[in-house]
């Protein structure tokens, strides 16, 4: 119901949960959806940092400001830290890039993960066989059906 109204007002539905006028997309969120790195600052903040060797580290800061400050003054305000296993990278990558209606270039996979296109080919083939991703695949993008069933499309890469 709201989509036609937004479209008539000049908005484009560029992200699964985001609309904007041309040239006015949220650059902050695009960093996430393109599986880029970001550094946490402040209580409850999260980081995704890729090291030179390709290791992807996720961190979460303490949630409550008092706890965050107490830990930051002592040593570190990091409440949780984990390395994203290679087996998780395909899902994390697709969870993010497929949120964008235009998807992402194929080379972004090797640029932002330790995976190759061959590593995720079984998932791509399954998504294509279900009509969720196009054939041939020139970008990581969904078909209209894949967009309508985005969670199902992303789940294939779990």
Give the role of each language-model region:
Residues 114-129:
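Short amphipathic alpha-helical interaction segments
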Residues 25-29, 130-131, 148:
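Short secondary-structure transition/capping segments
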Residues 1-115:
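C-terminal scaffold of the Radical SAM
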Residues 145-158:
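Short, amphipathic alpha-helical interaction segments positioned at domain boundaries
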Residues 15, 128-138:
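A short, conserved structural fragment
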Residues 139-144:
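Minor-groove-contacting beta-hairpin "wing" of winged helix-turn-helix DNA-binding domains
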């Amino acid at each position: 119901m709201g989509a036609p109204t937004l479209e008539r007002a000049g908005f484009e539905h560029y992200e699964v949960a985001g609309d904007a006028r041309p040239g006015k997309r949220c650059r902050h969120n695009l960093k996430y959806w393109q599986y880029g790195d970001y550094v946490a600052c402040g209580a409850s903040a999260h980081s995704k940092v890729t090291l030179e060797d390709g290791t992807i580290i996720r961190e979460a800061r303490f949630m409550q400001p008092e706890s965050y400050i107490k830990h930051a003054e002592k040593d570190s305000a990091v409440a949780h830290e984990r390395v994203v296993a290679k087996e998780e990278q395909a899902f994390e990558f697709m969870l993010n890039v497929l949120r964008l209606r235009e998807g992402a270039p194929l080379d972004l996979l090797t640029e932002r993960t330790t995976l190759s296109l061959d590593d995720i080919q079984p998932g791509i083939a399954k998504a294509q066989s279900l009509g969720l991703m196009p054939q041939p695949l020139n970008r990581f993008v969904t078909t209209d059906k894949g967009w309508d069933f985005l969670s199902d499309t992303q789940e294939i890469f779990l």
